[in-house]
Amino acid sequence: MQDRPWDRDKDYDTLVKWWTDWEFGMVPKECLPPDGIVVEVDGKPICAGGLYVGEGTQFGFMEWIVTDKNAEQRTAHKCLKICIDSIMKLATDKKLKLVYTATKEQALHKRYTKYHNMVLTESNV
């Protein structure tokens, strides 16, 4: 398993396929953050996520966390851990003091608190 920076141009078709498979809405390429991570296994992308950074601030917003719906569940789980940890490292490297994220997916809520030491500050919003 290997993480790498995402390339909005080259990775966009993969992201669109994953969003479509999961029946998520589609995000225009120009609206994706320039900073993001893709995790691959043997050169095959398994998951990805992005990090918006507020210009002139030390605030980040982690968004668009998504996996290949056809990936084996354990592999996707391990890749997600790498992806989110890599996004948080990217935030640290950029000297961000706060990274916020929002999701209605309970599995991600649990993942963020259990595996990534994130604090749930709001729910049902």
Predicted features by range, described:
Residues 54-63, 71, 75, 120-124:
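A conserved beta-turn-beta hairpin within the catalytic core of GNAT-like acetyltransferases
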Residues 67, 73-91:
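Conserved acetyl-CoA-binding loop-helix of GNAT-fold acetyltransferases
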Residues 110-118:
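Short, aromatic/basic amphipathic alpha-helical patches
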Residues 3-4, 24-27, 117-123:
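Short secondary-structure junctions
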Residues 99-110:
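Conserved beta-strand-loop-alpha-helix junction that forms the acyl-donor binding cleft
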Residues 16-42, 47-67:
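A conserved beta-strand-loop-helix scaffold within acyl/acetyltransferase catalytic domains
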Residues 93-96:
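Short, high-confidence coil segments that cap the C-terminus of an alpha-helix
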Residues 1-15:
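A short beta-loop-alpha structural element at the N-terminal edge
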